[in-house]
Structures are given as structure tokens and as C-alpha cells.
Amino acid sequence: MCIRDSAVHSLFGLLLWQSKQLVRGELWMALATVGHQVEEQMLVMLQWHTAASHQDATDTWYGGRHIAQWLDPRLSAALPKTWSGYDVDGAWEALVATLDLFSVAARQVADTGRFHYPADDERQLREWLSERQPERTEPRRSDTP
């Protein structure tokens, strides 16, 4: 298993753990502790995506600095949805948006021949999440007048 395989499985495991905390009502742990680890894995994949997408040496800085300058604009547009406020509905939406964005970036890196993307594992994770994600309890902020 290469480091990229490990990164994908680590992110999948973290999202599974985060979802379990949300199911148990442990919002603080889900967002603060696990959420930080999820963000770190996401950043690594976004950096790899940038490196795989550019022939020239693109500087991805560190810690996400200047991310708007080096990240693919299509991925950058999806990034805000991966963050939530302190609410369960928003946390679930951000979790799924994180998986969506990570999946796009990781699949594109995998397509360059750098590793095999575990599509079956992603499908199983998505099924697990969809079975446990509650119906929205409040309207989205954008849904209110």
C-alpha cells in the first residue's frame, strides 16, 4: 500500500469516526478533534492534486496558505461547503461535502497512475453514511427568507 492509498483510507476512517460521533450527539468532538484531522487529510490530497495537475513546480506552501492561488478553481469553489457551523445538520452536510470534494481530487490523482482509488470502499462508506444521516431538522440558512 502506498502513502496515497493510506491517505484515502485514513480519510475514510476519519469520516466514519466523525459520523459516529454525530450519531452519538458528540458534536464538539466531531467538529473540533476529528474535524481537524479530516482537514489535514483533505489538505494533503489537495496538494497532491495540484502537483499532479501541473507540469511546472507549483508551490502549495504549507498549512493551506494561499490556497486560493494554487488550488484548482473548481475544487476551490467546493471548499466552503466542507466547513460547518456548530450544528448537527451543518456538520453532516459538511461531512458529505468533504467526502465529495476529496473523492474528486483523489480520483483525479489516481487517474494519473499514482495509485488505485478504492471506489468500492467509498461506495460502502457512502451507504453507511446515508443510512445514518438524519433528515434535516431546520431549514438551511439559504432556505429562509
Give the location of each predicted region:
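Conserved nucleotidyltransferase catalytic core and NTase-mimicking acidic/glycine-rich helix/loop elements
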Residues: 4-145
